Amino acid sequence: MDSNIKKLLKEFYLIQCKGWVKNTGSGTSSAGTTLEHLFGKQEDALPLPDYLGIELKTKLITSKYEIRLFSAILDNKPDLMNKLWQLCSWKCTRNGGTRSLYDNFNALQYSNTHRKYAFKMHINYAKKCVELLLYNNWDKKKVNIDMSWSFRELEQRLKIKLSHMALVHAEKFVNKETKEEKFKFLDITIYKLKSFDVFLKLLEQGIISVELKMYPFKDTERQDKFRNRETTFCISQENLPLLFEEIDTSNYVIN
């Protein structure tokens, strides 16, 4: 891995030397997409690290969003994400009445929401899974849904995707006249994952949360398909040292 880290640091240094670069992405993740393009990586949805076994994460210096670690669907039975959608989604008036489902929740308490259903996690060591719990706010009672993520699947995703991670900070500039966006990539920090057991403990403590997003396509031809159909595990930048060890790269020679 040392040689891969050296290659990554060299490529990042060359990217830094470019200064401000044109945005080649779109949406809230455009800085990350632009960086991946500069590294020669094309967009994909594969659960694999981005570059030589190292996952790339990009964060704008002005962003307050948590870092999205990895995505994994509920897996104890088939088609659970669609079943969750059918049960919990609602009509969104600002999107022309199309249905949506989104929330952010952890293992400490049910998500604070005015909607019908609230979510929470429970780490079940006996069954080796992370259970999704559901509460009906209107009827004031828990709902039995039997949905969960297996330890096996979560550990596999975590270790393959995030054994090593690089966090890059970026600055954004928008030309007021042309609306053209550019990014400057400022610094890079390399991390090594501690363990899956640590991941589970941070879930229990509410330090790692889950972001749920399910949005269907707006056009009539694809209304039965989703732009997003995922649950993503997230952590704040401040809490990264709880899950990862920072790798000292000060002695790495770039040549």
Sequence positions of predicted segments:
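Nucleic-acid endonuclease domains
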Residues: M1-L52, T58-N255
